[in-house]
Swiss-Prot record:
UniProt-recorded name of the protein: Superoxide dismutase [Mn]
Superkingdom as given in the UniProt entry: Bacteria
Gene3D superfamilies documented for this protein: Fe,Mn superoxide dismutase (SOD) domain, Iron/manganese superoxide dismutase, C-terminal domain
Keyword Oxidoreductase: yes
Subunit structure: Homodimer.
Known catalytic reactions: 2 superoxide + 2 H(+) = H2O2 + O2
Organism: Listeria monocytogenes serovar 1/2a (strain ATCC BAA-679 / EGD-e)
Length: 202
């Protein structure tokens, strides 16, 4: 398989004024595209990997040949992480979760506001580059963060929501104000997509 950028379900300016057009365009066409290019380069010459998605590769890193494992971890993770990220954003997003995900969040974290507080703290505390995640682990919700482009899938956890806290995701608009960027994220979350991911992961 040749890995490709997923088609964005909205235009670069659709998330304004929350996420700016320039950042979205650079993030997608430069950063994500580089992960796709480098992943394709890494797996070239390994036909045994040709049928595997990026998600499958990072879920089973031990099955990836050792000489390309680091590249697949970084670039396969970058491709899988960003593919999820674009899908859980929406110009019609925001508000609060509904359905099974709402019930599970309240069961695990108390209230939606308490969940937000814990998620924000995980995203703000991630030193350097990485991600904050809401994941399903053994049927229960957890908040975790990962370094660089590491994926929760590599730890057997299924992501429901993910927030990119690499500086490339926010610096043009928010500069060093990561907490402001994190708070803005809640205005553009596609809860319908998050609900689907949660239901599929249970």
């Amino acid at each position: 398989m040749t890995y490709e950028l997923p088609k964005l379900p909205y235009t670069y300016d659709a998330l304004e004024p929350n996420f700016d057009k320039e950042t979205m365009e650079i993030h997608y066409t430069k950063h994500h595209n580089t992960y796709v290019t480098k992943l394709n380069e890494a797996v070239a010459g390994h036909p045994e990997l040709a049928s595997k998605s990026a998600e499958e590769l990072v879920t089973n890193l031990d099955s990836v040949p050792e000489d390309i494992r680091g590249a697949v971890r970084n670039h396969g993770g970058g491709h899988a992480n960003h593919t999820l990220f674009w899908s859980i954003l929406s110009p019609n997003g925001g508000g609060a979760p509904t359905g099974n995900l709402k019930a599970a969040i309240e069961s695990e974290f108390g209230t939606f506001d308490e969940f937000k507080e814990k998620f924000n703290a995980a995203a703000a505390a991630r030193f350097g580059s990485g991600w904050a995640w809401l994941v399903v682990n053994d049927g229960k919700l957890e908040i975790v963060s990962t370094a660089n482009q590491d994926s929760p899938l590599s730890d057997g956890k299924t992501p429901v929501l993910g927030l990119d806290v690499w500086e490339h995701a926010y610096y043009l608009k928010f500069q060093n104000r990561r907490p402001e960027y994190i708070e803005t994220f809640w205005n553009v979350i596609n809860w319908d997509e998050a609900n689907k991911r949660f239901d599929a992961a249970k």
